[in-house]
From Swiss-Prot:
The chain crosses the membrane at residues 45-62. One of its GO terms (cellular component) is peroxisomal membrane. Disulfide bonds: none annotated. Residues 81-100 have a biased composition (Low complexity). The modification N-acetylalanine is found at A2. InterPro entries: PEX22. May be tethered PEX4 to the peroxisome membrane and may be involved in a late step of the matrix protein import. Does not play a role in the biogenesis of the peroxisomal membrane. The gene is PEX22. Keywords: Acetylation, Membrane, Peroxisome, Peroxisome biogenesis, Protein transport, Transmembrane, Transmembrane helix, Transport. This is Peroxisome biogenesis protein 22.
Length: 283
């Protein structure tokens, strides 16, 4: 039993245009009769002519794409056949001419990976770079001696001896490269002052070129050390006395408070570390 196929949209449009054409032809034949022509004006004739032209162009617009598709289909088929055959020939030639790739050994892969890892490994900054970064381009630094540069922690101990901490020498050298460094301390007598200068000279502090004996200042009271700092107006001051750090916080841009235990309250511009070596990352 044959199945009835529904007409396509194009066929329906063609039928509609044919009916419209027949209707227009009938109307035109009746209008152009001898009795009707006399009653027509120029507007009616123009409307009829426009309708006829519209029907003709609509018919050509519907008919032309179908004919063009029918004419172009063989070319597409031929082009697709040529393309597929060319692709097949190219793939066969590639398979025929290709040589089995060399397989790298695990040792070679590991060696290449090691080179890549070493190349992209982050570079560790030098001590000089760390000092300069921590000081924030500070051009002048003041620092007390007891408990920071010297092993001794009180003026009474300086009456017996003065010992420079060996671990601080490298940091001192880097600080003197970038900043104007002043050392200061409270002493009880002239003999203590001489012992301190001799200890610094024996440690090679004055031979580096950045520090001279004239930049080592002595006083007899803690207030005297505070006055030194206020007069010099450094960018950084390093001290172990929390009271002095608190007093100078309003006047000095940055301070480093050296202490084993961090104070409960410190100003925002006061940093705390167990030693200057630890603060600058040299230990």
């Amino acid at each position: 039993m044959a199945e009835s196929s529904s007409p396509s949209p194009t066929e329906e449009i063609v039928r509609l245009i044919k009916r419209l054409s027949a209707y227009v032809a009938f109307k035109m034949s009746s209008l152009f009769s001898t009795t009707s022509i006399r009653n027509l004006d120029s507007r009616s004739i123009g409307a009829i002519a426009g309708l006829a032209i519209a029907v003709i162009f609509t018919w050509r617009a519907i008919r032309t794409p179908g004919e063009q598709r029918q004419r172009r289909q063989p070319k597409r088929r031929i082009h697709n056949a040529e393309t597929s055959s060319a692709a097949a020939a190219a793939s066969q030639s590639n398979l025929a001419s290709s040589v089995a790739p060399e397989v790298s050994s695990p040792r070679e892969d590991n060696a290449v990976q090691d080179v890549v890892d070493q190349f992209f490994q982050p570079v560790k900054p030098t001590l000089g770079q760390i000092v300069r970064q921590k000081l924030s381009e500070g051009r002048k630094v003041t620092c007390r001696l007891l408990g920071v540069i010297l092993e001794e922690t009180s003026p009474e101990e300086l009456q017996k001896q003065a010992t420079v901490r060996s671990s601080v020498l490298e940091v001192l050298l880097e600080i003197t490269k970038y900043s104007d460094l002043y050392l200061m301390e409270r002493v009880l007598d002239d003999e203590s002052e001489a012992k301190v200068l001799q200890a610094l000279e024996n440690a090679g502090v004055f031979t580096s070129g950045g520090l001279v004996k004239d930049k080592v200042l002595f006083c007899s009271t803690e207030i005297g050390r505070t006055s030194f700092v206020r007069q010099l107006e450094p960018d950084w001051h390093i001290d172990t006395n929390p009271e002095i750090s608190t007093q100078l916080a309003r006047f000095i841009k940055y301070q480093l408070h050296v202490a084993t235990v961090k104070p409960e309250r410190t100003a925002p511009n006061v940093f705390t570390s167990q030693s200057i070596e630890q603060f600058f990352g040299s230990v």
